[in-house]
Design a protein with these regions (language model features):
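Short, functionally important secondary-structure microenvironments
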Residues: 1-192
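A short, hydrophobic C-terminal helix/tail in secreted or cell-surface proteins
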Residues: 193-197
Length: 197
């Protein structure tokens, strides 16, 4: 990526975040936002990413900057012992909805960016049947694929979870659903293991 493009995208990220966050470009597998340091890291990949993907990654991480409460996140993981992966997938769905609501012009950016990532097999799903994946992974792909276009199968009980994820508004909602979902999935695994014995 050209230096001027990096700089302009970094300034855009700061504007969207409505604060003077630090933006760094590093050789990392994916973008992330450090809630405590207020640091947004953008990956540098061997194969140059499209503007749609870059804008998607920035917009997604800006969602965390704007809407993910640091103290509550830390408490949810460290004290409430909610599995990080469940919390993250569910929080991602919430913050993406909220950032698209705040910046309506980003809706198509998310759709085009995720289409590009899915097409390039970023999520390693090309040679897999998504419907055979764990529920948390199917939920993640459902929301990443702009659930309007998703053809992922869910049971009626799972569709209730999908609907709840669509309607998340607060981080408290996220914590509650993540805890319930991790317990539900643990119960399914336990039941499946018992049936195999």
């Amino acid at each position: 990526m050209k230096k001027t493009n990096k700089e302009s995208k970094s300034y855009l990220a700061k504007l969207l975040a409505t604060e003077n966050i630090t933006v760094e470009h590093r050789k990392v597998p994916t973008a992330f936002f450090d809630l405590q340091k207020r640091l947004l890291v953008v990956p540098i990949w061997k194969q140059e990413m499209s503007n749609d993907v870059l804008d998607l990654l920035l917009s997604h991480e800006i969602g965390h900057a704007l809407f993910t409460p640091m103290k509550e996140w830390k408490k949810a993981v460290d004290i409430d012992k909610i599995p990080h992966s469940f919390l993250n997938v569910i929080e991602d769905a919430r913050i993406e909805k909220l950032v698209k609501r705040k910046y309506a012009g980003l809706r198509q950016t998310f759709i085009r960016g995720y289409r590009d990532l899915i097409e390039k097999d970023f999520f390693k799903t090309k040679d897999r049947d998504i419907n055979d994946m764990l529920l948390i992974d199917r939920l993640n792909m459902h929301f990443k694929s702009s659930y309007i276009e998703s053809d992922i199968d869910f049971t009626s009980a799972e569709l209730d979870i999908v609907d709840r994820m669509k309607n998340l508004e607060t981080f408290e909602d996220v914590k509650k659903l993540a805890k319930e979902l991790s317990e539900y999935c643990s119960c399914l695994l336990y039941t499946s293991d018992a049936a195999d014995d």
